[in-house]
């Protein structure tokens, strides 16, 4: 086993294991991961859900990581028929707008650029191609596991412009912010980020304000709340009179989140609950929030397949324009249209499921995706395809 990689993963996931020994990490795995995949414990909670539910309820898990866990472990198939889970827009790759991907393709194609990105983004289709196509055509496109890796590449290649594709929700904002601060402290003028950061609370507001919304309760994204806390959500709970429950990503976390949501609904309680307290606090990570506020400011942001949601994104503050790839590489305005066959926007808003798409598994596959929900490791369509959850009509 790659222990250094495991340490990195656990540090990122829980935020509590920095500097621990291998033996301590092994114990932490047992405590924080293994028991939360225990089939007996999961079935016990499932039994309690069955005893509790008396009415039909529609719940939305907001995060793509939760969606994959639900489909992978068959959680939705074990639930009583009264409970329907619909999938939310919490997949950062899936909601990155087509126009910004096209800008990334233009920037990455320039001969003096090293374009760095997480691996998922390389296969997301733009209007006509993807970043893998740029790489195949000779562009210097590199997969990195951290924006700090991109900063190091910029330090080692002063003659090149290094651009990091900074996508994601609140969870990935702190390392992206730190990359900018580190580049500034190192005096690097050849590092910039192409920003497509989005925020969860405005997305939930947009979903619930739609007259077509069927969502009666939310499973909030635990990792987002680990960074930002959950102090922004009581306002939404009060406004729309629905319960919200902070939920983790392991099977036991998810069924506990479902149970807590169902209990609140059955009791007619409108409140927010946090059964994921081993990771999440009400305030969140204050230091991370302060760094985000130092570098980013809120802005309107377009979500792929959904449209523009007011104040749902972050952009670099003007004093950090030197690190703004959109300003450094003025590629102008780009207009792009989605495939008319792709219903990813409906899926991301919980209005449909992958099996409702006529292109699923035929015209749209992971090898030849029409939309980002079939590409991303957190996309709902990719989860359904990978785990064989849909009968394909041909």
Provide a role label for each language-model segment.
Residues 256-346:
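Internal helical hairpin/lid segments
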Residues 62, 87, 116-119, 164-167, ...:
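Short beta-strand segments
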Residues 28-159, 173, 202-204, 328-367, ...:
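Metallocofactor- and cofactor-centric catalytic cores in central/energy metabolism, strongly enriched
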Residues 85-87, 139-147, 185-202, 216-219, ...:
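Short, acidic/small-residue loops that bind anionic groups at enzyme active sites
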